């Protein structure tokens, strides 16, 4: 029994001289979650809800001579589509989708461009949106309806964009080009 008391006493003494252990603050953070429940036959792919398109670089010589840069694909992917079961209230299965692009910053004219809103901006240039057949998209008006494949749960809506000289008589100057557009889908 005396031996057990010595062990207990030694343990008690060692606890007196042991430094408390604290968890070091090795970083912390906060996560914000955002989502939306929609009533539609398809979901927009998460990467295409808030999309960034790199239009690349174009020289002032090229854009002032050709009046635009090279075109870049602007695809909107739809996922988890259930087209045969969707009628959008019409009684007929959904087979098409209309897309309307718009912006609060656009040039004037018959087919406005998205205005360059960059702080270190190039002048005399905007961004043109085009449909899959290279037709100009009129901002604020529905683009031609696109056919949807009822047998597929995934769809890709093809569009294009490029930097375009606003007025062919006024040279574009060098600098950044930034423009923003919103889009709304209308299933039919």
UniProtKB/Swiss-Prot annotation:
GO biological process assignments: cell adhesion involved in single-species biofilm formation
Gene: ybgD
The entry's keywords: Disulfide bond, Fimbrium, Signal
Annotated family: Belongs to the fimbrial protein family.
Pfam families: Fimbrial (PF00419)
Name of the protein: Uncharacterized fimbrial-like protein YbgD
Annotated Gene Ontology cellular component terms: pilus
Keyword Nucleotide-binding in annotation: no
Chief localization: other
InterPro entries per the UniProt record, alphabetical: Adhesion_dom_fimbrial (IPR000259), Adhesion_dom_fimbrial_sf (IPR036937), Adhesion_dom_sf (IPR008966), Bact_Fimbrial_Adh_Pro (IPR050263)
Superkingdom, taxonomy of origin: Bacteria
The species this protein was found in: Escherichia coli (strain K12)
